[in-house]
Protein backbone atom coordinates (compact mmCIF):
# COMPACT_ATOMS: atom_id res chain seq x y z
CA UNK A 1 0.00 0.00 0.00
CA UNK A 2 1.61 3.31 -1.05
CA UNK A 3 2.46 5.76 1.71
CA UNK A 4 0.10 8.66 2.07
CA UNK A 5 1.57 12.03 1.19
CA UNK A 6 2.32 14.21 4.18
CA UNK A 7 -0.26 16.88 4.80
CA UNK A 8 0.99 20.42 4.84
CA UNK A 9 0.58 22.18 8.14
CA UNK A 10 -1.56 25.28 7.84
CA UNK A 11 -0.19 28.18 9.84
CA UNK A 12 -2.14 31.25 10.86
CA UNK A 13 -1.07 34.62 9.47
CA UNK A 14 1.25 35.55 12.34
CA UNK A 15 2.89 32.12 12.41
CA UNK A 16 3.42 32.13 8.65
CA UNK A 17 4.89 35.61 8.71
CA UNK A 18 7.24 34.64 11.54
CA UNK A 19 8.29 31.52 9.63
CA UNK A 20 9.07 33.51 6.49
CA UNK A 21 11.03 36.10 8.45
CA UNK A 22 13.13 33.41 10.11
CA UNK A 23 13.85 31.71 6.79
CA UNK A 24 14.75 35.05 5.23
CA UNK A 25 17.00 36.06 8.11
CA UNK A 26 18.94 32.83 7.79
CA UNK A 27 19.18 33.13 4.02
CA UNK A 28 20.29 36.76 3.99
CA UNK A 29 22.85 36.05 6.71
CA UNK A 30 24.35 33.12 4.79
CA UNK A 31 24.25 34.62 1.30
CA UNK A 32 24.33 38.00 -0.37
CA UNK A 33 21.08 39.77 -1.14
CA UNK A 34 21.32 38.98 -4.86
CA UNK A 35 21.97 35.29 -4.18
CA UNK A 36 18.78 34.83 -2.16
CA UNK A 37 15.93 33.56 -4.31
CA UNK A 38 12.23 34.03 -3.55
CA UNK A 39 11.66 30.69 -5.29
CA UNK A 40 14.00 28.96 -2.83
CA UNK A 41 12.39 30.64 0.18
CA UNK A 42 8.89 29.67 -0.97
CA UNK A 43 10.04 26.11 -1.59
CA UNK A 44 11.62 25.87 1.85
CA UNK A 45 8.46 27.24 3.46
CA UNK A 46 6.40 24.78 1.39
CA UNK A 47 4.18 27.52 0.03
CA UNK A 48 3.64 29.12 -3.35
CA UNK A 49 5.45 32.26 -4.44
CA UNK A 50 2.06 33.94 -4.63
CA UNK A 51 1.39 33.27 -0.96
CA UNK A 52 4.84 34.54 0.00
CA UNK A 53 4.20 37.73 -1.95
CA UNK A 54 0.92 38.10 -0.07
CA UNK A 55 2.96 38.61 3.12
CA UNK A 56 5.90 40.44 1.56
CA UNK A 57 5.22 42.00 -1.86
CA UNK A 58 8.92 42.16 -2.80
CA UNK A 59 12.20 40.58 -1.76
CA UNK A 60 13.29 43.99 -0.52
CA UNK A 61 10.23 44.18 1.76
CA UNK A 62 11.18 40.82 3.24
CA UNK A 63 14.78 41.89 3.71
CA UNK A 64 13.86 45.17 5.42
CA UNK A 65 11.33 43.42 7.69
CA UNK A 66 14.05 41.00 8.77
CA UNK A 67 16.42 43.86 9.56
CA UNK A 68 13.74 45.59 11.64
CA UNK A 69 13.18 42.41 13.63
CA UNK A 70 16.91 42.03 14.31
CA UNK A 71 17.12 45.68 15.39
CA UNK A 72 14.17 45.31 17.76
CA UNK A 73 15.68 42.18 19.33
CA UNK A 74 19.01 43.93 19.91
CA UNK A 75 17.39 46.92 21.61
CA UNK A 76 15.17 44.63 23.69
CA UNK A 77 18.29 42.84 24.92
CA UNK A 78 19.64 46.07 26.35
CA UNK A 79 16.36 47.11 27.97
CA UNK A 80 16.61 44.02 30.20
CA UNK A 81 19.55 45.58 32.05
CA UNK A 82 18.60 46.96 35.51
CA UNK A 83 18.46 50.74 35.65
CA UNK A 84 19.28 51.10 39.36
CA UNK A 85 23.03 50.63 38.92
CA UNK A 86 25.93 53.04 39.20
CA UNK A 87 26.82 54.49 35.77
CA UNK A 88 30.01 52.43 35.41
CA UNK A 89 28.23 49.20 36.41
CA UNK A 90 25.34 49.91 34.08
CA UNK A 91 27.70 50.46 31.15
CA UNK A 92 29.41 47.12 31.81
CA UNK A 93 26.10 45.25 32.21
CA UNK A 94 24.75 46.86 29.04
CA UNK A 95 27.87 45.87 27.12
CA UNK A 96 27.54 42.31 28.42
CA UNK A 97 23.97 42.23 27.11
CA UNK A 98 25.08 43.72 23.79
CA UNK A 99 27.91 41.21 23.38
CA UNK A 100 25.54 38.37 24.33
CA UNK A 101 23.45 39.32 21.31
CA UNK A 102 26.52 39.71 19.10
CA UNK A 103 27.73 36.26 20.13
CA UNK A 104 24.38 34.47 19.89
CA UNK A 105 23.26 36.15 16.64
CA UNK A 106 26.55 36.94 14.94
CA UNK A 107 25.29 36.54 11.37
CA UNK A 108 22.21 38.64 12.00
CA UNK A 109 24.31 41.31 13.70
CA UNK A 110 26.74 41.60 10.80
CA UNK A 111 23.84 41.57 8.33
CA UNK A 112 22.17 44.45 10.19
CA UNK A 113 25.24 46.67 10.21
CA UNK A 114 26.72 45.88 6.82
CA UNK A 115 23.48 45.74 4.88
CA UNK A 116 23.33 44.02 1.52
CA UNK A 117 21.42 46.06 -1.02
CA UNK A 118 23.59 49.13 -1.35
CA UNK A 119 22.39 52.57 -0.34
CA UNK A 120 18.70 52.03 0.36
CA UNK A 121 16.75 54.75 2.21
CA UNK A 122 14.62 52.31 4.19
CA UNK A 123 17.58 50.15 5.22
CA UNK A 124 19.51 53.28 6.19
CA UNK A 125 16.53 54.40 8.28
CA UNK A 126 16.46 51.05 10.14
CA UNK A 127 20.18 51.23 10.92
CA UNK A 128 20.04 54.91 11.92
CA UNK A 129 17.03 54.22 14.11
CA UNK A 130 18.60 51.29 15.94
CA UNK A 131 21.76 53.30 16.57
CA UNK A 132 19.74 56.10 18.13
CA UNK A 133 17.83 53.63 20.33
CA UNK A 134 21.02 51.86 21.38
CA UNK A 135 22.70 55.14 22.32
CA UNK A 136 19.71 55.92 24.52
CA UNK A 137 19.69 52.41 26.02
CA UNK A 138 23.31 52.63 27.14
CA UNK A 139 22.62 55.67 29.34
CA UNK A 140 18.95 55.21 30.29
CA UNK A 141 18.33 55.13 34.03
CA UNK A 142 21.56 56.99 34.81
CA UNK A 143 22.17 60.67 35.58
CA UNK A 144 23.56 60.89 32.05
CA UNK A 145 20.23 60.11 30.39
CA UNK A 146 18.88 63.69 30.08
CA UNK A 147 22.21 64.83 28.66
CA UNK A 148 21.84 62.68 25.56
CA UNK A 149 19.17 65.01 24.25
CA UNK A 150 20.20 68.16 26.07
CA UNK A 151 23.91 68.34 25.35
CA UNK A 152 24.89 68.03 21.66
CA UNK A 153 28.55 67.30 22.41
CA UNK A 154 27.59 64.33 24.57
CA UNK A 155 25.11 63.03 21.98
CA UNK A 156 27.76 63.21 19.26
CA UNK A 157 30.34 61.54 21.49
CA UNK A 158 28.05 58.66 22.49
CA UNK A 159 27.01 57.98 18.90
CA UNK A 160 30.63 58.11 17.81
CA UNK A 161 31.46 55.64 20.56
CA UNK A 162 28.66 53.38 19.36
CA UNK A 163 30.28 53.30 15.91
CA UNK A 164 33.50 52.20 17.61
CA UNK A 165 31.55 49.46 19.44
CA UNK A 166 30.09 48.19 16.16
CA UNK A 167 33.42 48.00 14.33
CA UNK A 168 35.24 46.53 17.33
CA UNK A 169 32.52 43.88 17.78
CA UNK A 170 32.67 42.80 14.13
CA UNK A 171 36.47 42.71 14.24
CA UNK A 172 36.27 40.59 17.39
CA UNK A 173 33.78 38.20 15.76
CA UNK A 174 35.96 37.75 12.70
CA UNK A 175 39.42 37.70 14.26
CA UNK A 176 39.06 36.92 18.00
CA UNK A 177 41.99 39.18 18.85
CA UNK A 178 41.16 39.28 22.56
CA UNK A 179 38.95 37.56 25.15
CA UNK A 180 35.38 38.82 25.26
CA UNK A 181 35.79 40.20 28.79
CA UNK A 182 38.77 42.25 27.65
CA UNK A 183 36.74 43.66 24.76
CA UNK A 184 33.90 44.54 27.15
CA UNK A 185 36.29 46.33 29.50
CA UNK A 186 37.93 48.21 26.62
CA UNK A 187 34.58 49.45 25.29
CA UNK A 188 33.45 50.36 28.79
CA UNK A 189 36.57 52.37 29.59
CA UNK A 190 36.29 54.33 26.34
CA UNK A 191 32.69 55.35 27.11
CA UNK A 192 33.54 56.19 30.71
CA UNK A 193 36.42 58.34 29.45
CA UNK A 194 33.95 60.22 27.25
CA UNK A 195 31.65 60.69 30.24
CA UNK A 196 34.51 62.03 32.36
CA UNK A 197 35.26 64.67 29.74
CA UNK A 198 31.65 65.71 29.14
CA UNK A 199 30.19 65.35 32.64
CA UNK A 200 32.88 64.61 35.24
CA UNK A 201 30.66 65.69 38.13
CA UNK A 202 28.19 62.88 37.44
CA UNK A 203 30.78 60.12 37.79
CA UNK A 204 32.36 61.33 41.03
Which role does the model predict for each range below?
Residues 75, 121-146, 155-163, 167, ...:
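Amphipathic alpha-helical packing segments from all-alpha helical-bundle domains
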Residues 19, 23, 27-61, 65:
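Helix-turn-helix
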Residues 79-104, 147-151, 184:
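Hydrophobic alpha-helical connector segments
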Residues 16, 59, 66, 70, ...:
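Hydrophobic/aromatic residues within well-ordered alpha-helical segments
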Residues 1-15, 201-204:
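N-terminal intrinsically disordered/low-complexity leader segments
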Residues 66-93, 138-142:
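Amphipathic alpha-helical linker/stalk segments
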Residues 102-125, 139, 166-174:
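Amphipathic alpha-helical segments used for helix-helix packing
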Residues 110-113, 181, 203-204:
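Short, hydrophobic secondary-structure boundary micro-motifs
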Amino acid sequence: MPARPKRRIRLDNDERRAQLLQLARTAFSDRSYDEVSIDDLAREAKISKGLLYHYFPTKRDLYVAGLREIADELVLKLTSVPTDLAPADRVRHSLDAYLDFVTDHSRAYVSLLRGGIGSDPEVNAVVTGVRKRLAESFVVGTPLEPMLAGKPAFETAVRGWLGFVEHASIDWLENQRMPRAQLRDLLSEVLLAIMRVVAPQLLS
